[in-house]
Amino acid sequence: MAQTQTFNGRRRVRKFFGKIPEVAEMPNLIEVQKASYDQFLMVDEPKGGRPDEGLQAVFKSVFPISDFSGSSMLEFVKYEFEGPKFDVDECRQRDLTYAAPLKVTLRLIVFDIDEDTGAKSIKDIKEQDVYMGDMPLMTLNGTFIVNGTERVIVSQMHRSPGVFFDHDKGKSHSSGKLLFAARVIPYRGSWLDIEFDSKDVVHARIDRRRKIPVTSLLMALGMDGEEILSTFYNKITYVRAGDHWRIPFNVERFRGLKAVGDLVDADTGEIVVEAGKKITARQARQLGEKGLKAIKATDEDLLGNYLAEDIVNYATGEIFLEAGDEIDEKTLKVLLGTGEQEIKVLDIDHVNVGAYIRNTLNVDKNESRQDALFDIYRVMRPGEPPTLETAEAMFNSLFFDSERYDLSAVGRVKMNMRLELKAEDTVRVLRKEDILAVVKTLVELRDGKGEIDDIDNLGNRRVRSVGELMENQYRVGLLRMERAIKERMSSIEIDTVMPQDLINAKPAAAAVREFFGSSQLSQFMDQTNPLSEITHKRRLSALGPGGLTRERAGFEVRDVHPTHYGRICPIETPEGPNIGLINSLATFARVNKYGFIESPYRKIVDGKLTNDVVYLSAMEEAKHHVAQANAELDKNGGFVDEFVICRSAGEVMMAPRENVDLMDVSPKQMVSVAAALIPFLENDDANRALMGSNMQRQAVPLVRAEAPFVGTGMEPIVARDSGAAIGARRGGIVDQVDATRIVIRATEDLDPGKSGVDIYRLMKFQRSNQNTCINQRPLVRMGDRVNKGDIIADGPSTELGDLALGRNVLVAFMPWNGYNYEDSILLSERIVADDVFTSIHIEEFEVMARDTKLGPEEITRDIPNVSEEALKNLDEAGIVYIGAEVQPGDILVGKITPKGESPMTPEEKLLRAIFGEKASDVRDTSMRMPPGTFGTVVEVRVFNRHGVEKDERAMAIEREEIERLAKDRDDEQAILDRNVYARLSDVLVGKEAIAGPKGFKKGSTLSKDTLDEYPRSQWWQFAVENEKLQSELEALRGQYDDSKKALEQRFMDKVEKVQRGDEMPPGVMKMVKVFVAVKRKMQPGDKMAGRHGNKGVVSRIVPVEDMPFLEDGTHADIVLNPLGVPSRMNVGQILETHLGWACAGMGKKIGELIDTYKAAGDIKPLRKTLESFMPANDRNEPIREYDDESIVRLSEQMRRGVSIATPVFDGAHEADINIMLEQAGLHTSGQSQLYDGRTGEPFDRKVTMGYIYMLKLHHLVDDKIHARSIGPYSLVTQQPLGGKAQFGGQRFGEMEVWALEAYGAAYTLQEMLTVKSDDVAGRTKVYEAIVRGDDTFEAGIPESFNVLVKEMRSLGLNVELENTKLDDAPVRLPDAAE
């Protein structure tokens, strides 16, 4: 048995229960963000120039800009980015935006225009680089740093550009008649609606304005009435034959019609169909096959038809009848009178073909193109007199001008597919053919041919990601700039200026800033834990600019649609008003270049499943039959069953196996990342699964993270892609490691131009956006070998590279003295004592010293009227020490502000004149700890404006920072030296040197000892004969010198940044930030939850000895109510409990075997147990090939409990759980005999007990509890404010008043409505009375009564109080004491 593999213990090993092999690699989970923005910026110019997309396309669409006279033109040449001024960490610390300066090369061309001929000749060309503002860059984790905070740009779902056909579902008309409509939606530009009204006339609307007949629109496109009719209708020719007419027999036309009179064959004269009979499709076909060519028609048969052409007297030019006229008795006479031998009529039978366009033409008042253009002009610009030129220009700019109208490539592709056109996707404007095809399709729909579109189908909705949103925003900015440039070009002497003088980049920069700062889609990143970050980046919102609004979104838009399968998660969406409008991308989904969401499928060729994976969008998928991932296969990859369950065109059906051509790649491809983390998801009710997905995102990172015993196999993927855990960029050997960084000497990808050292900085106790703590811990030791992609450091909520949002706790499902009524949770004191659910929270407090009108504010320790006791935590600069324990009301930063001078009395003036200047008044505006917050100061940062003298504290912080930078530089230098000289030594040893330092004998062979005789800096003087080797040495030397220079330069830059002042908001001289960390232990009132939507609030923390315990004395950690399971239907939690129990039992068994191995030295039983627990297959670890040391290391990891993975929809079954319980030596019922901790008596029945994974949620009682006695009041009503943030009071509302009224508590009620609320004078008097120790007071008039009186007066109703004197003194109830 070849035991070749080793296990380093740096990752968690799981037993997989999944049966379905994973073929497709899961795409990087934040690829959506990164790929989109990279495509927009294209920082590095590819060979052959940048393609026309992203930023390049924006510049190309706005430039060239010409002035109004055409005598000069500004062209765009190229753009490039310089390096960002500050790196990511510096931006976070200094509240800056992480951005790179954008340089654009512009070319100004000045023309000479010949006044006589108007010919242009180039007079002058100038090129120049122009700075166009800063462009925010994306961090490696797909976020942006704007003003020091991390933000995410959420992708938006919107209706795809293109054409959509729909009807009103019978709502508009009382008869319930369906009114069909078509809408052409461009990416930008005017919308075109074409719709039927209740009279079956077709109208067009532009931009939802007044409607016009659609024929007017067609006339404006240059068609006349006859052309319109011939486009929409076929013609039938009546040919005169003696006393009757002949009309050709057309099979299609006659099928389904009822014969009014006998149908007679025009050639033979026989009756082929009798009067009153309906002609079926079969009959019509048979008649055609029998050779029926034409049928007889009488003059009467012409009645009711419509003429297809004008009837003209060619001699006089007189028009007798016009095309489209209906033939009635009168017109028939005229017709027969003209003696026409051939009459062409429109093929309209009112059954298969309706007369809608002809009727529309009939009601249309416009006769010519000019009339139609004028009509459209009046609709679009009411009140302006039209001329032909302005009307033509306006009409062309609506749909046919690429600057005003853009269908986009997507729109063109969708339009081609829907209307079966063949235009290139570079044709981005409408064409006459497009509009005609839309009208034709709409009329066919009305005639009952074809289907309407489903707007909720994902083939009709697309995703706009960061890059595209940014592109649109930047285009807006550039267009604003364009106007200014045009005006400046016309008003300035163009010969003397450079492009720089014409451009003011402010509008463009402002558009970017506005988008990142205040757009609805630019959101403050949810950084509670790594899962919430990843989910936020994968979110799809239907809200936002150009999207839906909460109020207007109906039920259909929010609902799950069959096309969501594998694209959008049907489970994860918020509860509340946004339900269904905010969605999450499914695990394997990706967004294609047109913005449609694609899902992967495996191909089935000739009935055999292949490993070829294709990505299809919803439109492409509709044509296929897709089998589920869990369909049963034989060993050759064919389907076992004759009929297979599959999806086709949105329906689930049983199809013969020959018809199935695709299969899902994985059972978890239909759910999102958060839902894929829930084990036994298939056993949970969907509503609870939704809560479970959402609550995992609120789990607070704990001090000790612990991965779940029962996972799904998704945990390492989330930890890796979120960037919380750090993976090695390339393989190598760990050279140095401490808490703040890891240094790895690379052994692969050794590029001569690159440094051979990778340094990974770890984040230590950083504050996240949600005030949770971000802390990374190294997993490697010095000398460890690592491979590319290995996890070398854990982050918040990760353990050994696995996502670890909570802890495994021992749960008993039983009632316990009513303390778990209504989902409450009973905890053991052990949880608190052992810091199981303890988390660290960091708050940031910021204080600014400004320059005020009365003088500058000052940060100082010298604060008026403050005792020395209150200043004990401050240093001489007035800033709190690091490590100080602070509580509510403590001063963090002392600050004084100049007070306004009060006017002086003459006496004061005299005294001041005699005794000189008295110190001007200052008031204390120090920053104090807010109520209800305790903690320890962990970090202080001081920022000074340029040129403001730094205080002692700022200097100390600066010195520490520079020392840290110097240490980093020295360490890097040492590693670089060691690395380079090791490589140099490898090249030189054993070679013959032809030159060397002083005292070296030429021609001798170099050895390690020879080299050691000389200082390392002299080794470069050795030369070898082999030219190739010698050039390698020189290259190494050059690389070494360059690296050294770069290192020093980087150090100098950073020191310079630290020493120079900081950029501050206007008026701010100095800013201090204090970070206070607090350890939050579990306490009653905190919210906890499992992964199955089983949430509850901690009701009581009980001493360990009172908790129920097992026979061996193990106490339960947590007691949950069994009644929380049946009605909620989330049975997954019970299965998880059983499996967790088996995991712990197995771990205990392995632990005992390790102990025996350590005592007796026989590893075979341990190896055997591990091999039987984890049988060899392609998903499990190859335990057979492990050496003994690895087996022990693995067993130590499993001691607390083994880890298993049960993937969603492909997880462990009941039988698997039973087998595992048996392996662990436990009862297969999963129930145990428990004993009451207080009496020691056994409980009557056995109790389900096991390990469940519980999370502590970010709803902590400390952040919610709040009390007030006196605080701020609202200015108008003088009532106390509301809410904890405003330090408000409790509202005594309408219903509470009723309660006091019901009890007859008159005085209490009076106090509530007056002195405890808004009786201003009364509440002051009460305060004074209490201070005096007196308890008599009177209630006055509430301020809200005065507000009411004033509001009535503002309506013109004068309300006055009658001041009649009350004779009697106010009644006072005798005190009980009297």
Curated annotation (Swiss-Prot):
GO terms for molecular function: DNA binding; DNA-directed RNA polymerase activity; ribonucleoside binding. InterPro entries: DNA-dir_RNA_pol_bsu_ext_1_sf (IPR042107), DNA-dir_RNA_pol_bsu_external_1 (IPR019462), DNA-dir_RNA_pol_su2 (IPR015712), DNA-dir_RNAP_su2_dom (IPR007120), DNA-dir_RNAP_su2_hyb_sf (IPR037033), RNA_pol_bsu_bac (IPR010243), RNA_pol_bsu_CS (IPR007121), RNA_pol_bsu_protrusion (IPR007644). The keyword ATP-binding does not apply. Gene3D superfamilies: 2.40.50.100, 2.40.50.150, 3.90.1100.10, DNA-directed RNA polymerase, beta subunit, external 1 domain, DNA-directed RNA polymerase, subunit 2, domain 6, RNA polymerase alpha subunit dimerisation domain, RNA polymerase Rpb2, domain 2. It comes from the Bacteria. It catalyses: RNA(n) + a ribonucleoside 5'-triphosphate = RNA(n+1) + diphosphate. Keywords: DNA-directed RNA polymerase, Nucleotidyltransferase, Transcription, Transferase. It is an enzyme of class 2 (transferase). Its EC number is 2.7.7.6. GO terms for biological process: DNA-templated transcription. The RNAP catalytic core consists of 2 alpha, 1 beta, 1 beta' and 1 omega subunit. When a sigma factor is associated with the core the holoenzyme is formed, which can initiate transcription. PANTHER family: DNA-DIRECTED RNA POLYMERASE I SUBUNIT 2. Belongs to the RNA polymerase beta chain family. DNA-dependent RNA polymerase catalyzes the transcription of DNA into RNA using the four ribonucleoside triphosphates as substrates. This is DNA-directed RNA polymerase subunit beta.
